[in-house]
């Protein structure tokens, strides 16, 4: 099997397991009576921890191969939460001394995300 297809299968399998895990966490930790999304917060924080742990092991040891990193960091964490990848990319920019770009990415994603969400909702209202 060509390497690209194997990588695609690893990411897909990890994503399936990650998305399933996210769904299960949402069942166990719903809005615990307060209206606060504890399940989403737990998933986002756990995903940040996992992608940091996996990425560091892949750099500083031979415990995590490139294939295992694809399965766990890109696949599982990507299916579990995209927030972890976002935080890792910001940290990578900061580590590389790219303060301007890390700040632009951080604020641009938050403000841009909120604006895109709003405009998407408004467009959907026109069609509904």
Swiss-Prot record:
**Modulation of this protein's activity:** Na(+) is not transported, but it plays an essential structural role and its presence is essential for fluoride channel function.
The catalysed reaction is: fluoride(in) = fluoride(out)
Q: Does the keyword Plastid apply?
A: no
Give this protein's Gene Ontology molecular function annotations.
fluoride channel activity; metal ion binding
Classify the protein's membrane topology as the record does. Multi-pass membrane protein
A GO cellular component annotation here is: plasma membrane
Q: Where does Na(+) bind?
A: 78, 81
Q: What is its main location?
A: membrane
Q: Which domain of life is it from?
A: Bacteria
Q: Where does the chain cross the membrane?
A: 1-21, 45-65, 70-90, 99-119
Localization of this protein: Cell inner membrane
Alphabetically sorted, this entry's keywords are:
Cell inner membrane, Cell membrane, Ion channel, Ion transport, Membrane, Metal-binding, Sodium, Transmembrane, Transmembrane helix, Transport
**One example of a Gene Ontology biological process annotation:** cellular detoxification of fluoride
The UniProt record lists the keyword Ion transport: yes
Report the Pfam families cross-referenced here: CRCB
User: What is the protein's known function?
Assistant: Fluoride-specific ion channel. Important for reducing fluoride concentration in the cell, thus reducing its toxicity.
The record's comment on protein family reads: Belongs to the fluoride channel Fluc/FEX (TC 1.A.43) family.
What is the protein name for this chain?
A: Fluoride-specific ion channel FluC
Q: Which organism is it from?
A: Chlorobium phaeobacteroides (strain BS1)
